[in-house]
């Protein structure tokens, strides 16, 4: 956990508290203070929402007797590393949509960083990444995961290519230097019942975490991105979903379950 990040839990109304796991009561207290939520003695068995498990690594857990397992942000995770190992500049659809196959060190803003998986893959492929995340708890978990990755010799190089900015993209994008926002990538939070890039447990946790908090609509995200990207905007969409309302994309790059709509700014 990074002591420098102070969080406002108002945009994470679904976060109910922190529960210590094993020998981590001090970590639980520190997380609770940072996030502005209570330390809970036990995991609630009923109700709705999300708790943070103070473990190594920390993880988010849905409430409820039949809730799926916890979701952690861990850039040393074997499944994520398999995805990185299988990604190349020319084969990975996101990398091609961003344009890394032509300019591997492109400066990319992942304006909706979420769990960081897409942004990590782009960084591993050579992109200079700026991550923006409006959720205080996700931003704090991303920060802690990046700190762990920087201390790991195998992943330090990738981690050093990432800068994290907690906050709202509509406010932060204008403050970024133009050289750091050649491409702006957004992965909107899709409504319940739709298929998004992160399915299953991660999507359930993110929806429960944000609960009724209202962030920018996807067309507002697109407008903000188009207003500040210097080369292009890339939007992740379900394969059969309509494009985000607004100007039509210049083209699309298809993946297995999703597609990436590309909006050329200077093209």
Curated annotation (Swiss-Prot):
S-adenosyl-L-methionine binds at residues 133-134, 187. This is Ribosomal RNA small subunit methyltransferase J. One of its GO terms (molecular function) is rRNA (guanine-N2-)-methyltransferase activity. The gene is rsmJ. Its EC number is 2.1.1.242. It is an enzyme of class 2 (transferase). It catalyses: guanosine(1516) in 16S rRNA + S-adenosyl-L-methionine = N(2)-methylguanosine(1516) in 16S rRNA + S-adenosyl-L-homocysteine + H(+). SUPFAM superfamilies: S-adenosyl-L-methionine-dependent methyltransferases. Keywords: Cytoplasm, Methyltransferase, rRNA processing, S-adenosyl-L-methionine, Transferase. One of its GO terms (cellular component) is cytoplasm. Its main location: cytoplasm. Belongs to the methyltransferase superfamily. RsmJ family. Specifically methylates the guanosine in position 1516 of 16S rRNA. The keyword Endoplasmic reticulum does not apply. It is found in: Cytoplasm.
């Amino acid at each position: 956990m990074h002591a420098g990040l102070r969080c406002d839990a108002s945009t994470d109304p679904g976060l109910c508290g922190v529960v210590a796991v094993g020998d981590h009561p001090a970590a639980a207290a520190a997380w609770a203070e940072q996030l502005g939520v209570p330390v809970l003695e036990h995991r609630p068995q009923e109700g709705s929402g999300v708790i943070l498990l103070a473990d190594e690594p920390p993880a988010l857990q849905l409430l409820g007797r039949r809730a799926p397992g916890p979701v952690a942000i861990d850039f040393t995770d074997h499944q994520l590393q398999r995805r990185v190992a299988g990604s190349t500049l020319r084969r990975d659809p996101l990398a091609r949509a961003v344009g890394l196959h032509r300019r591997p060190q492109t400066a990319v803003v992942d304006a909706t960083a979420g769990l960081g998986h897409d942004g990590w893959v782009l960084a591993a492929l050579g992109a200079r990444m700026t991550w923006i995340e409006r959720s205080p708890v996700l931003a704090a978990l991303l920060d802690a995961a990046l700190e762990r990755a920087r201390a790991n010799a195998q992943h330090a190089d990738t981690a050093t290519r990432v800068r994290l900015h907690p906050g709202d993209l509509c406010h932060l994008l204008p403050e970024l230097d133009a050289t750091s926002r050649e491409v702006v990538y957004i992965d909107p939070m899709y409504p319940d019942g739709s298929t998004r890039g992160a399915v299953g447990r991660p999507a359930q946790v993110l929806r429960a975490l944000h609960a009724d908090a209202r962030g920018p609509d996807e067309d507002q995200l697109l407008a903000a991105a188009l207003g500040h990207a210097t080369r292009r905007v890339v939007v992740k969409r379900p394969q059969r979903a309509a494009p985000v309302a607004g100007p039509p994309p210049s083209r699309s790059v298809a993946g297995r379950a999703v597609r990436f709509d590309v909006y050329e700014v200077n093209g």
